[in-house]
Amino acid sequence: VTAAIFITLAAHAAAPNTNAASNAQANGPSLITSAAGVRLRESPDAGSAEVGRLQLGLVVEELERSAAKARVGSTEAFWHRVSAPGGARGWVFGGLVAPFDPARRDEIYVRLASERVAHAAATFPELTELVRFLERATKEVRRRDALAELELTRLVALGRSLASFSIEEQEKPPYKPWVTEHEPEIVYSEPAGQWYVRADLYWNFEKKYRGLPVAERAAWQGAQTPLPGECEGYLPCHLYVQKISNGQYLKLYPRGAHSDAALANISELLGHVTEDMRGANPVFDVPRADRAEFRKTVAEMRAQLALVPARKKARVLGQLDAISRRFR
């Protein structure tokens, strides 16, 4: 992560713009930065000199506030002169900070994490800074549900950070150090040329927080996380992958928010298999030596669907029956 991401300590306090009226705040309220790499400026003007940068989720003390709002881009807000940990002082635009109340720390952290991870166009620096914030935040919250939300968001943000750079960039900074730092939590897929968060971390999370709404989301995340390697035409491998992903989700959450999508994923694969079986040169195969184990996997998949409503699972069960007959 580049040094610019983290707070740069100013060598001296940035003086307020003497031409801009401001409201002095003695023992002013606390604010929290709501974006990555927030610029700390010498005066309340977007064109003034930059004296430092503040990382996402940093709590600062407000010293002054501009008398009038200003417009930066499409946002209209006050400017705030702040004091940051380490002694840096300067002006930040109000669109990049939010009120912070220590008594509402859990709620504020969860909301900030949710807002930032929802930013679909987030860059690698923004995602790594989000991960850093969440690593700090999980040590500060008290409620179990808040901790769970932050832990899951951290895994999701980590996964997105790994997907934000190409195979050609993997050995270059800042990507290589990031991968090395998180190697215990990630796995590399040679065929895809990409790093993924280990799927078992999501399943372990689901078990740890089962009973909380966040556990269902973790199970779905685990089901959709790619696994390293590839199955090619080896059908037992394809079914095993479905069993430990979408099938496992349906076993745990047969009526869950993503149950229809999980069934559709399984059915899509099985549909390709049944269509392939009707061709002259089928790609999918089950060697005779592996058919006993294959039938066991099919039976386990059927069992995973036991509590799924009958009308919803009928298509998948029919596809499994057809495949079972083909590879007796």
Question: Where are each of the predicted segments found?
Answer:
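Boundary regions of SH3-family modules and the immediately adjacent low-complexity/disordered segments
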Residues: N23-A24, G73-R136, P174-P184, Y188-V197, ...
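Short coil/linker segments at helix-helix boundaries
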Residues: A163-D200, N204, Q224-I244, H272-Q304
